[in-house]
């Protein structure tokens, strides 16, 4: 496992850089590339048997000049390209080309400040303590408390209700 970590890290870096290289391609081009890569992957998968050995299919002819090792490298490149498109699909789906307006004709607008989420730990702790205090004073915690009628019960919140 220890020896495979550098390989896994390098493959993740390769996927990351492949995806970032074409992060802002137009949607139509990205869709066509993805369809072509999917077709290629389906073709590659159809040539593999369950045990991982190649089957010879006459309908999918490769040029005779390409060696099996080159074919394997080409298949790996296609798979990596498809994986990079799938991994970065969520990030690139909203990617738009940035068009900067000409600064001489249009005044620059400052973005509106985002409203800060003011919910924090202190508010949460305050609300929990308030809830506990109120529920205690209401008598919700008094189910196992025995009220002695001979004593003054006006000061005991559990017996006074």
Curated annotation (Swiss-Prot):
Superkingdom field: Eukaryota
Glycosylation sites: 56
Compartment annotation: Secreted
Signal peptide as annotated in the record: 1-23
GO cellular component: extracellular region
Keywords on record: Glycoprotein, Secreted, Signal
Protein name: Epididymal protein 13
Biological classification of the source: Eukaryota, Metazoa, Chordata, Craniata, Vertebrata
């Amino acid at each position: 496992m220890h020896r495979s970590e550098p390989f896994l890290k390098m493959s993740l870096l390769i996927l990351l850089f492949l995806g970032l290289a074409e992060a802002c391609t137009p949607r139509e081009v990205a869709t066509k590339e993805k369809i072509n890569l999917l077709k290629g992957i389906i073709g590659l998968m159809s040539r593999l048997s369950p045990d991982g050995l190649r089957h010879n299919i006459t309908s999918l002819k490769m040029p005779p000049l390409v060696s099996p090792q080159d074919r394997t490298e080409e298949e790996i490149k296609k798979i990596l390209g498809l994986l990079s498109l799938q991994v970065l699909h969520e990030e690139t789906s909203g990617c738009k080309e940035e068009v900067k307006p000409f600064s001489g004709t249009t005044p620059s607008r400052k973005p509106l400040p985002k409203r800060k989420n003011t919910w924090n730990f202190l508010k949460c702790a305050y609300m929990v303590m308030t809830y506990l205090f109120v529920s205690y004073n209401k008598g919700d915690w008094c189910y196992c408390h025995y009220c002695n009628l001979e004593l003054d019960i006006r000061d005991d919140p559990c017996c006074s209700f």
